[in-house]
Amino acid sequence: MWTSWWLWPLVAVCAADQFRDLAVRIMQDTPVIDGHNDLPWQLLNLFNNQLQDPGANLSSLAHTHTNIPKLKAGFVGGQFWSAYVPCDTQNRDAVKRTLEQIDVIQRMCQAYPETFACVTSSTGIRQAFREGKVASLVGVEGGHSIDSSLGVLRALYHLGMRYMTLTHSCNTPWADNWLVDTGDDKAQSQGLSHFGQSVVKEMNRLGVMIDLAHVSVATMRAALKLSQAPVIFSHSSAYSLCPHRRNVPDDVLQLVKETGSLVMVNFYNDYVSCSAKANLSQVADHLDHIKKVAGAAAVGFGGDYDGVSRVPSGLEDVSKYPDLVAELLRRQWTEAEVRGALADNLLRVFEAVEQASNHAQVPGEEPIPLGQLEASCRTNYGYSAAPSLHLPPGSLLASLVPLLLLSLP
């Protein structure tokens, strides 16, 4: 017995290799669908969305968590690319900038057709898998991107948006964000306002996944109660393990379980360990916890790569997903549970959202009350009591008569 002590490290290495080999085999059949990647923001920040810039070559892009070789090494088969614009665009140029971020995602697919396939459905994801491409979908990160307009919501859907985060780190006029729970923002909607409920219903009608990352706990509960389809948290972790208000508390995880919804675990150190440093094992702890509380069907990956300043040791970039999967296998996750976390759980939710959609239903039309909007940079067409030039003949004159009478001496 004592003579074989020198074999122990070799046995440990072989066991580790065994789990990673199994992870690779699984991921060759079931590549990961990640819920949130901010590469489009980096393309704006570094290159002003100019993909022809030599430095923006996605095959050799440096200083980012994401490039094509890293995606291939990580067995990434599906990616929700974030069409993110900051909160300071709210009530200003949020819609314009969101359109530009959707455009750069679409141009990524056009520039690298051998790697990316822009798709808009669960069927499209499966087809991209078969072709060995990265199924590329648009997630709009923040309800401020629709400028409180159901019409803009519908337009973004037609441009390919398949999930929308109800808020970023700021309230919209119709939904409260996570900073309400820290006391840094004041609650405006107590979760969702009447118009916020209309947004959720219209997303259900269209077949857009409702994303509750970044929202307040009251907004989480309101949306989970109201939605007629499962929802997602595209990049959030477990509050019980790291009490950061961007994470999901256990009582909400119970609602996730009851509604067949999904939490895609974030890799940002501050949400994993509540400190500047974290490691791969701690990310696996979050996956374990969500599995324990909400069930294996409620777990996914939402790394938040290229949207955060620090990531865990062992998960330095998108190439490292197989190492995390190997850790789950070491923790005795079954192959079916691993395949669920990689892709099958997201596909199930997406298919349920598609099935719950009803394009034959009349679209939502009731606008948000003008008084709920910041009005300094907007017109009031449609809200105005001023006479319309498009009234029936005679109506304009009739509406002016009281004004003329008031002007008489």
From Swiss-Prot:
Residues 1-16 form the signal peptide. Pfam families: Peptidase_M19. Substrate binds at residues 168, 246, 304. A lipid is attached at residue 384 (GPI-anchor amidated serine). Inhibited by L-penicillamine. Inhibited by cilastatin. Zn(2+) 1 binds at residues 36, 38, 141. It catalyses: an L-aminoacyl-L-amino acid + H2O = 2 an L-alpha-amino acid; leukotriene D4 + H2O = leukotriene E4 + glycine; L-cystine-bis-glycine + 2 H2O = L-cystine + 2 glycine; a beta-lactam + H2O = a substituted beta-amino acid. GO terms for molecular function: beta-lactamase activity; dipeptidase activity; GPI anchor binding; identical protein binding; metallodipeptidase activity; modified amino acid binding; zinc ion binding. It is a lipid-anchor; GPI-anchor. Changing residue 288 to A: Does not affect dipeptidase activity. GO terms for cellular component: apical part of cell; apical plasma membrane; endoplasmic reticulum membrane; extracellular space; microvillus membrane; plasma membrane; side of membrane. Coiled coil: none annotated. Gene3D superfamilies: Metal-dependent hydrolases. Glycans are attached at residues 57, 279. PANTHER family: DIPEPTIDASE 1 (PTHR10443:SF38), MICROSOMAL DIPEPTIDASE (PTHR10443). Belongs to the metallo-dependent hydrolases superfamily. Peptidase M19 family. This is Dipeptidase 1. It comes from Sus scrofa.
